[in-house]
Amino acid sequence: MDGSASSPVGDLLFVSSSGGHLAQLVALRPWWTGRRRHWITFRTPDAESLLAGETVDWAYHPTTRHLGNLLRNTVLAARTLHRYRPDVIVSTGAGVALPFFVLGWLVGIPTVYIEVYDRIETPTLTARLCRPFTSALLVQWEEQQRLYRGATLVGRLL
């Protein structure tokens, strides 16, 4: 991703789980500073601290094998995309990303999935599920390019 604030990307929607997934998106601060942005993540102490002063909607968790929260997050995605109308959706996973990528893809919003830095030998489930709805897949390790044909190597975020 171009580090300059003058690159052609407009309003950003960041979607991720809390913890390391969120930390990797926050590490992109030089790229997103100065742009209008909105965050979707889980309400945890680390997320509240990292995103103090940011515009955030809290997602429902757990997301693994929890149909109720998948449906709630799908409603959240529809409401957020309608209200905020981002120019691009960026995510490092995990499960909360899927409804945002599917609905974003359906309405023509570009989606960027950044594979997490700690999965080098096998693809994550979220990356596999989001891949059909992903405009650009970015990886942090050269080894990850073997897992995802056509992925772009961007290097480590952390």
Where are these regions (language model features)?
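N-terminal subdomain of nucleotide-sugar transferases
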Residues: 1-42, 51
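Conserved nucleotide-sugar phosphate-binding/catalytic loop shared by glycosyltransferases and other
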Residues: 16-18, 35-73, 143, 154-157
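Short, well-ordered alpha-helical microsegments
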Residues: 21-24, 47, 97-100, 122-123
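An amphipathic, basic-hydrophobic alpha-helix
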Residues: 64-88
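An aromatic- and histidine-rich active-site surface loop
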Residues: 88-107
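Active-site-proximal region of nucleotide-activated glycan assembly enzymes
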Residues: 109-158
